[in-house]
Curated annotation (Swiss-Prot):
PANTHER family: ARGINASE/AGMATINASE (PTHR11358), FORMIMIDOYLGLUTAMASE (PTHR11358:SF35). Pfam families: Arginase. Its cofactor is Mn(2+). Mn(2+) 1 binds at H130, D155, D159, D241. Belongs to the arginase family. Mn(2+) 2 binds at D155, H157, D241, D243. This is Formimidoylglutamase. It catalyses: N-formimidoyl-L-glutamate + H2O = formamide + L-glutamate. The keyword Metal-binding applies. The keyword Hydrolase applies.
Amino acid sequence: MTQWYPASPALWQGRDDSIEAPDARRLFQTVTRSEAFFPENWQQKIALMGFACDEGVKRNSGRPGAAGGPDALRKALANMASHQGHERLVDLGNWVAPTPDLEGAQQALRDAVSRCLRAGMRTLVMGGGHETAFGHGAGVLDAFAQESVGIINLDAHLDLRQTDRATSGTPFRQLAQLCDAQSRAFHYACFGVSRAANTQALWREAQWRNVTVVEDLDCHDALAQMTQFIDKVDKIYLTIDLDVLPVWEMPAVSAPAALGVPLIQVLRLIEPVCRSGKLQAADLVEFNPRFDEDGAAARVAARLGWQIAHWWR
């Protein structure tokens, strides 16, 4: 059974510069850490949650270790400067999945996300493998059942695989099937896709599903496509698989990208999403601290989370 645990206060530590000025503060001083999962107490805040699960990565023959991602990212965030938007972050702890119950873990995350959104919060989830996306996305669909939900994925992989059970490579096929079951449109855009990492069958599935696909080679000039996708939906769920970044910026993932999309381009693509007023949920997935020797990759991932919270409108 999936268990919920509050985040350890030891993760939120940093240098205290408050003697310099009242606003010389860092995230460890402005993030609120909750000892109970009760989102109804935190309306209009951003729920920071961890999904400590890499069972989907294991099933997908990937490199395990992403279950340690949420706490590693908290530590990297803690000492970053606190600016506008960061005071809204409330740490609502981790959902910890026992092996091999991926499906139960995804259901627990789905229920938690839906509860947060219905309570008036927004959700920022730290994975975990990209199996995070099915639980997170399903929770968003549940919370906004009468509105069109757009799923924006920055990822080297389409993650539309067809297998006999859920993995880190199946979440968007699962979400498509959920939309089919609910008789609603499946709005999915994937930016940063590597043609070399996706079979022809996956490209065919994306075409059949009317997925907006932008290859890694074309992301330098993709703002118009991003804006067009934003404009056609009511609510947005943004998911960032860190393997969209090039290996020299992000080696600490299950499947490092030989080419990838540089961090600065990723930031330029997500800025209009964050500022759109439509973003309800976001996540960072696939960070694997086992392959981050000096903490540099954690800081790269944390900068993405920092920027999302700062830009979020």
